Design a protein with these regions (language model features):
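Long, basic/Gly/Ser/Thr-rich N-terminal segments
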Residues: 1-157, 450-451, 555-557
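Glycine-rich, often acidic-flanked micro-motifs
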Residues: 2-45, 178-194, 208-557
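A short, charged
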Residues: 121-129, 175, 465-469
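Ampiphathic alpha-helical segments that act as solvent-exposed interaction surfaces
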Residues: 146-165, 528-543
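Short capping loops/turns at secondary-structure boundaries
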Residues: 149, 153, 175, 192-196
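N-terminal pre-Walker A segment at the start of P-loop NTPase domains
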Residues: 154-178, 183
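Conserved lysine of the Walker
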Residues: 199
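Post-Walker A alpha-helix
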Residues: 202-203
């Protein structure tokens, strides 16, 4: 490997493959030709007459052509009660798909709930398809996803979550969040953040505290609940007033706000465990506040292998798992990251865990450095990690229908120019952050969620027009957003649910840049101090708080 190259991937044995074996690490290591989002990606298939039919025809034509010559896998899974069917001829995608999600049998065994009779979402993920580009397509009208000639699991997972999320919002008022969640002393904290701001670090870091349980690493389902007069917590999925007006899914919250006196309005609701109830509006105790509950989505977490940089002890299980796109590293990379690798190795050598000690005791520091360097070199290298093998089973939410009560929502950012460390957000500020969705590289992801199955261009055009109006008038962006007609339905869904989230939780802004504090020695101390800020905030749920780089010490010391 040339000295100026930091890492590289083994070449494909033939130019037509979309996946092949990488240099050994973990249980397996699959290299995918596409290692990120496909250049061609279309979430507005329904806007082009005949396109969906052509895509389905192409998929079935390819399946017929390879019938009997290559394995084709069809596997149904359950994602928060929604049944999803994937059809693929990719060994890698099938392998990760069945590991990632609950099968129908696993869902029923774990939750005690029977799966639906038929899938609501259909997925085709096929490689070797002649006449098709490396591309991804989504039809909202038919809940159909088609991926051609790409084996990168990350995009497949994200688009499936997005498609399921649209169903849950429209039909059930359930909010799908690209975020991570941890419980501490019975209170849940939900982190919402773009990549590169410390979401995983903040999640795993909080696990060093007592009375904590790990909930979610990447995706969370949130239900906003009312209390009934007999003490049950329910979320309303449909309502019909005595005046004939109706609402369903995400629309029910505002409808109830506007019809509080319609005591005989009929409601269809569900309990936290999915028991269906028929109620009237007078059965709800509307004097009680809304409460948010979060549910996990994945059976086994698909996460970045560079987790070992901040949490070295995770290396044991990551190296005992299936990998995707873990590269080889050069001597230049090892030299450039020597200090970081020395710290990781030091922690691994000091670990008292018996299995971990056995795995690493026979390896030299040079071998360990190379292994760990491979895990942290490429930002999109992934592992399929069973978190119950990293943490004790009683410290993990393993049942997808066991909720955690959310107390705090934390929007993470990493802005070196902003002296703010922690701030309790107003509704306008909370919504503006999510509408603009600025990432560390100055791009924009609405709701910090690139997974959403929406017309991104139409949404961004609507938001940017409102931003210009806000700049010219001085009116807060969210107020203009709320007042203007013509917003895409997907934006209406998303931000109505965020409005309800603000009512049901305490919402904060956290800037993960304590390394710029001259009193902080290194990154590890910065992470430790950030964890103390989060832990105290979750314990106390302070209102109106504003901490800066100059005064936050009194909060954590």
């Amino acid at each position: 490997m040339p000295d100026d190259v930091l890492y590289s991937f083994p070449s494909s044995p033939t130019p037509d493959l979309s996946e092949w074996a990488g240099s050994p690490v973990g249980v397996s290591n699959t290299i995918t030709r596409t290692k990120g989002r496909t250049t061609v990606h279309n979430k507005t298939v329904d806007g082009t007459p005949g396109l969906l039919e052509r895509l389905i025809s192409s998929a079935h034509g390819h399946l017929n052509a390879i019938d009997g010559r290559h394995p084709v896998y069809q596997h149904d899974v359950m994602i928060h009660g929604i049944r999803v069917r994937a059809t693929t001829n990719s060994d890698h995608l099938f392998d990760f798909w069945k590991d990632n999600w609950f099968s129908l049998r696993e869902w029923q065994r774990t939750t005690g709930q029977a799966p639906p009779g038929e899938p609501s979402v259909h997925v085709y993920a096929l490689h070797g398809v002649k006449g098709e580009q490396v591309a991804a397509y989504y039809s909202h009208d038919t809940n159909t996803i088609a991926f051609f000639n790409t084996s990168y699991y990350g995009q497949l997972k994200s688009w499936v979550l997005g498609a399921v999320g649209r169903i849950l919002a429209a039909e059930y008022g359930i909010h799908s969040i690209h975020g991570a969640c941890v419980e501490k002393s019975g209170k849940g904290v939900l982190y919402i953040a773009p990549t590169g701001t410390g979401k995983s670090t903040s999640s795993y870091g909080l696990m060093d505290y007592p009375k904590t349980r790990f909930h979610s690493d990447d995706w969370v389902y949130v239900r906003y609940t009312y209390q009934t007069r007999d003490g049950r917590r329910v979320f309303v999925i449909r309502v019909e007033g005595t005046d004939g007006t109706k609402a369903r899914g995400y629309q029910v919250y505002r409808w109830i706000e506007g019809h509080k006196n319609d005591a005989k309005a009929r409601l269809r609701a569900m309990t936290l465990s999915n028991q269906v109830l028929d109620l009237t509006l007078e059965d709800l105790d509307l004097a009680r506040p809304l409460v948010a509950y979060a549910y996990t989505s994945e059976k086994v977490f698909y996460l970045r292998t560079n987790l070992v940089e901040n949490f070295p002890l995770s290396a044991h299980q990551i190296l005992s798992s299936k990998e995707e796109n873990v590269p080889n590293v050069s001597s230049a990379f090892l030299a450039q990251h020597g200090k970081t690798l020395d710290g990781v190795i030091r922690d691994l050598r000091a670990a008292r865990d018996g299995e971990l000690h056995r795995m690493f005791s026979l390896k030299s520091d040079t071998e360990l450095a190379d292994l760990c360097a491979r895990l942290i070199a490429f930002d999109n290298a992934r592992s399929m990690l069973d978190i119950t093998k990293v943490l004790p089973a009683d410290r993990v939410f393993a049942n997808p229908m066991e909720p955690v009560k959310l107390a705090a929502v934390v929007l993470l950012k990493r802005s070196a120019d902003d002296p703010t460390v922690l701030e309790h957000l107003s509704l306008d500020d909370f919504m503006e952050r999510l509408l603009i969705g600025e990432t560390p590289d100055k791009k924009h992801e609405t709701a910090y969620n690139a997974y959403r199955a929406v017309d991104d261009k139409a949404e961004r055009a609507f938001i940017e027009t409102r931003q210009k109006e806000a700049l010219a008038s001085g009116t807060p962006l969210y107020q203009l957003f709320s007042q203007r007609d013509g917003k895409p339905v997907s934006l209406d869904e998303e931000f109505e649910l965020f409005r309800v989230m603000y009512q049901a939780t305490h919402c904060y802004d956290l800037n993960t840049t304590l390394q710029k504090d001259p009193r902080v020695r290194d990154k590890r101390e910065a992470v430790s101090r950030t964890m103390r800020v989060i832990a105290r905030t979750l314990d106390e749920e302070p209102k109106g708080i504003h901490l800066s780089i100059d005064n936050y010490n009194s909060y954590v010391d």
